[in-house]
Amino acid sequence: MNKKIFWNWSNNENVLYIDGVIAEDSWFDDDVTPKLFASELKNKSGDITVWVNSPGGDCIAASRIYTMLLEHKGNVIIKIDGLAASAASVIAMAGTEVLMSPTSLMMIHNPLTVAIGDSKEMQKAMDMLKEVKESIINAYEIKTGLSREEISNLMDGETWFDKNKAIEMGFCDGTLTDRRKDEKVTNMVFSRRAVTNSLLTKINKEVKTHSMSEVEERLKKIKNKWEEK
């Protein structure tokens, strides 16, 4: 395909973006689909960075993308800068390392479907949802090491995680740090040093302006004041 929806090549780094709804098919090429994803990924090798901001979508489509990333030859660094909800959280579990912005969120819940028909059809839909849930738990279990029961309960409650909770529960490995932080710290250190040197210079100058006789005279005055009291 000529239009590269996912890939952005800069500084010889393989940077991929999953931004939008995850769907099996897309009419306007504005959704994240396995077909489009695979066409961009299949000829690439080495380490890649995947930025994720998605409310989720089709769980089967997400499963296919998850598997592609899991099978990728190279490290897969997942960076969540906005939202990784529902099916998008499953994709995130394929990361060799998962990092979240301090303001980003992750959400996991039970799979949903729409069914029409009699009681037998409804039962089929319910059975299908149970199996889909078990497959999703597989991805969460591999990443977090939590028990299947724990994960199931979290999904039942539609659980939202900020980056701290996600790290605590094992869904995330660390925090996206501000690249400007080190620069700020360095500047602050030099600023403090400059201020300290400036103060020391000023103090030294003030000390030098007073002779020993002047200092002795001041001490005598202080002593006399105390004796008068």
PLM-predicted stretches and their roles:
Residues 1-79, 83-87, 95-229:
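N-terminal organellar transit peptides
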